[in-house]
């Protein structure tokens, strides 16, 4: 089985998943009480105006026609019009999605930078105090609600210590950098604006640490498990018998092989971070997709909520596709195994 045949299979799978998400979101949107045409027109609109809007949206057509039109629009990049703002949902997502991605990427980077070394040390010093501490941290991270942890760090670092800002992406008196990528850190660097860069970095620390804490423990446990498996292999004992230094064996022999089975977990963590950002952004008043969709839910903005579900699901499946291809590139035996 070649790389391109596997890529073709994964892409078909991606299309099927997105189609399935469209089916689910369409069904849910029609089960929820409420009239989108009435919500869009307003409470004081006449029945004639509401009926005109219903005809424009195609809500007076049979359900199968509405569904076919909805799926066709989704695959053309048209997610409908937001009831709350009157703007296309895709335009709204282009505004808020970069903020969520910046938070998710920074959180994943923190989880990897801290979690991988902890996992290595936990495996090397198995059943010692650091190993027990890492396992306790993993259990604590998984079981601690993100909103509770976020409120805790705000009270500590913003309320008592006054070390870091408690919300937002920038101080109110600063103008955002010129939009290039939508990531304030990168855009500020491209603009050469150090003041905006460091201010954006300060605002990013608390929410990214909060979001990274759960996945930090997961990454550490995954690396620990894979490292313990590799350290018990025959080639490690052979390397030790050859007189190679212990940490050289750990970092140059065991770690690369331990990272291979960890790629899936590390990649899918990014997809989880997109979902986890909803509560975190709400707590920290972070102007991303999470805070936007919470406001849309409160306003019964069905097109916005459905668009959020489709885009995040697509991003999650796309990350899964990249992980599968990366896994195949790192270990080509997977493709040969599938062919056999």
Regions found by a protein language model. Give the residues of each.
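Alpha-helical transmembrane segments of integral membrane proteins
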Residues: 2-6, 97-130, 176-340
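A hydrophobic, multi-pass inner-membrane permease signature
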Residues: 141-149, 193, 200
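N-terminal signal-anchor/first transmembrane alpha helix
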Residues: 1-60, 90, 94, 121, ...
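Alpha-helical membrane-inserting segments
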Residues: 24, 28, 118, 122, ...
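Residue-level recognition of pore/gate-forming positions within transmembrane alpha-helices
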Residues: 14, 22, 44, 112, ...
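Residue-level signal for discrete positions within transmembrane alpha-helices
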Residues: 96, 100, 136-143, 152, ...
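An internal, D/E-rich "acidic patch" concept
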Residues: 3, 60-116
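Hydrophobic alpha-helical transmembrane segments of membrane transport/permease proteins
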Residues: 17-68, 157-196
């Amino acid at each position: 089985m070649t790389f391109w045949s596997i890529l073709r299979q994964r892409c078909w799978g991606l299309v099927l998943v997105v189609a399935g998400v469209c089916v689910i979101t369409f069904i849910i949107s029609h089960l929820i009480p409420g009239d989108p045409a009435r919500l869009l027109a307003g409470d004081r609109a006449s029945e004639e105006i509401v009926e005109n809007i219903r005809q424009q949206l195609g809500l007076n057509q049979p359900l199968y026609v509405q569904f076919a039109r909805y799926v066709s629009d989704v695959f053309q990049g048209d997610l409908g019009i937001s009831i709350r703002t009157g703007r296309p949902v895709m335009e709204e997502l282009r505004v808020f999605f970069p903020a969520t991605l910046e938070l998710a990427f920074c959180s994943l980077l923190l989880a990897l930078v801290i979690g991988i070394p902890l996992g290595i040390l936990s495996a090397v010093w198995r059943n010692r105090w650091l190993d027990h501490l890492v396992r306790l941290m993993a259990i604590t991270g998984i079981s601690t609600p993100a909103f509770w942890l976020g409120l805790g760090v705000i009270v500590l670092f913003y309320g008592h210590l006054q070390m870091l800002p408690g919300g937002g992406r920038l101080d109110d008196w600063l103008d955002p950098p010129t939009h290039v990528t939508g990531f304030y850190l990168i855009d500020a660097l491209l603009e050469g604006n150090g003041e905006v860069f460091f201010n954006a970095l300060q605002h990013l620390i608390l929410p990214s640490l909060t979001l990274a804490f759960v996945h930090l423990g997961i990454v550490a446990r995954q690396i620990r498990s894979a490292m313990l498996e590799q350290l018990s292999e025959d080639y490690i004992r052979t390397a030790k018998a050859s007189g190679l230094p212990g940490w050289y064996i750990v970092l140059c022999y065991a770690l690369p092989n331990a990272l291979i089975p960890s790629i899936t977990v590390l990649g899918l963590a990014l997809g989880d971070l997109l979902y986890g950002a909803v509560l975190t952004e709400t707590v920290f008043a972070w102007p991303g997709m999470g805070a936007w969709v919470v406001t849309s839910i409160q306003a019964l903005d069905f097109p916005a909520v459905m668009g959020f579900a489709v885009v995040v699901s697509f991003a999650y499946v796309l990350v899964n596709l990249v992980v599968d291809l990366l896994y195949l590139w790192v270990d080509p035996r997977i493709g040969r195994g599938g062919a056999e």
